[in-house]
């Protein structure tokens, strides 16, 4: 495991889970609610009956609750952070489907599960694979090799165009944000490379400057296309929420209790939801 991988693992191992009680007074509670709602809707859009699910970058298992009432047969959770996996294992107790956990880096290690997955997902984690072309290809091949024909790969990921546009508005150092979040470009951010363009992302109560990378979704889409996988869904989070809040009003009212504040909205606008299908 190289230095950058160690730093990511250490970073997420140190993040403390927020209890339901503390969540109510969280400064980014609106962001958490919207993100959870959109991840739930994305899963429901593409999950199949009796599904095998592979979760790349599963973290502490926060999305296990979103699969609880879905037609899942077997779940495989993969994460680089060992302490996070311990909590995920604890959260899996009592679920109706089988669960397996792998302590591995999906952007450098070869991931092999016992049976092909109907759904592979990577929620807010796949952008770490864009540290290099090699790591992106390894991550993409882990998706491709573990996905059955007709299976779907879903991911929620930062939008490079939004990040670049906001950074360009600050001619001094390219950083941007507000009281709740901040993006600080690293020297590599300003290169013309397709990979390894880094920035530090700070998010209140969640992220404290872990190095992240601009995504190159055009490259990923072409790479998948060469393997017989096609993009079938792509939308920014703001458009997604504006559609899904009306598509399932009951779920929206149950999961999203608050209106996003003016400081929370720019955080939501940083992300996209995307899906690919293996033909």
Go through each PLM region and give its residues:
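N-terminal, positively charged/glycine-rich alpha-helical extensions of SAM-dependent methyltransferases
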Residues: 1-23
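Conserved alpha-helix/loop element of class I SAM-dependent methyltransferases that forms part
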Residues: 30-51, 66
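Conserved class I S-adenosyl-L-methionine
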Residues: 50-59
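Class I SAM-dependent methyltransferase SAM/SAH-binding core
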Residues: 62, 66-108
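A short acidic, Gly/Pro-enriched loop at the edge of an enzyme's catalytic core
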Residues: 111-120
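A short glycine-rich, Lys/Arg-flanked "PGG" loop and its adjoining helix->strand segment in the class I
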Residues: 135-149
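SAM-dependent methyltransferase
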Residues: 154-226, 232
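Rossmann-like AdoMet/SAM-dependent catalytic core
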Residues: 200-279
């Amino acid at each position: 495991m190289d230095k950058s991988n160690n730093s990511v693992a250490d970073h997420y191992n140190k993040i403390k889970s927020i209890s339901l009680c503390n969540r109510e007074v969280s400064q980014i509670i609106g962001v958490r609610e919207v993100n959870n709602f959109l991840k739930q809707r994305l899963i429901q859009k593409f999950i199949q009956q009796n599904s095998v699910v592979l979760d790349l970058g599963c973290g502490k298992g926060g999305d296990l609750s979103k699969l609880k009432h879905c037609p899942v047969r077997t779940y495989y959770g993969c994460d680089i952070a060992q302490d996070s996996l311990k909590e995920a294992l604890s959260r899996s107790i009592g679920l109706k489907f089988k669960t397996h956990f792998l302590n591995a880096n999906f952007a450098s290690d070869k991931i092999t599960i016992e049976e092909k997955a109907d759904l592979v997902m990577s929620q807010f984690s796949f952008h770490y694979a864009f540290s290099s072309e090699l790591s992106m290809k390894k991550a993409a091949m882990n998706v491709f090799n573990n996905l059955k024909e007709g299976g779907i790969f879903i991911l929620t990921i930062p939008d490079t165009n939004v990040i670049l546009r906001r950074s360009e508005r600050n001619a001094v150092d390219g950083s941007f944000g507000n009281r709740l979040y901040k993006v600080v470009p690293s020297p590599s951010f300003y290169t013309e490379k397709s990979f390894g363009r880094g920035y530090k992302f700070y998010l209140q109560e969640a992220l404290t400057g872990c190095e992240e990378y601009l995504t190159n979704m055009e490259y990923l889409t072409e790479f998948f296309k060469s393997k017989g996988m096609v993009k079938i869904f792509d939308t920014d989070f703001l458009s997604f929420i504006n559609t899904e809040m009306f598509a399932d009003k009951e779920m929206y009212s149950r999961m999203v209790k608050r209106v996003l504040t003016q400081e929370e909205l720019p955080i939501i606008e940083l992300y996209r939801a995307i899906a690919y299908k293996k033909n």
